């Protein structure tokens, strides 16, 4: 989350009123009343992000004995799930999904799954570019997506990460310093100055490229996208080749959102619960949205032939999903209210 830093000699109330999440004044967490953009000229904010993925990989290593660092990043079956669900041996038409990236970090959301449908990536480079597109603001929707679908440009040509702008302009013979300044201006959402646009035209930069730069509000760095893709590919390898370990670890890390009453009963019952939440649309609360993500994974798992066992007083763990006879045994924490 975002952490606002207040100088020792100041009080937060000099800058903004504060409030307690859910009006729980006895809690330790307070939030600023104003959006940070109202204060960003006065206070420093740190974005301290939590990542489950390193924990997931460590748990997968402990269960399978396979070191994620040794996973080949060119495994063909793993690469396939980013464009089809065929390596999983199932179809997911009921979820309006024809790729196998559900539950894969950075590639499992509805938004990115649609990107995968539109682009059908076949290489690590294309996955990296999709990661850059999905983490930017106004980079894909209303911008690169239209260019790709219209045939104006391909995925390999559109602007995906901030580095693409500088490298592209330099390769066309542009001035390195001006190319760098152009990249910095665009990635911060400041658009192009007349000088930058004139420089781009002097090296015959296509009009669609210039127009694309003007729409962008924020751009992801290429190295960051590469780190995300490598992590995602390693997790995906376990999903394809070691599904029992993958699903048990996925649920364990997200046990707080798991509800065994909604997840048991087989694929058709789970699908009915998925559709019930979807029907609520914007009326679905955060807990239901988190549960929907879990249920999609359970549905896919059931279609792959892996069942959820009932919670057992003598066999279930407190909070860890365990593998048992080719099936998965939920913990006590998966029971609502426990």
Q: What residues fall within each predicted segment?
A:
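Noncatalytic, beta-rich nucleic-acid-contacting surfaces in large DNA/RNA-processing enzymes
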Residues: 1-338
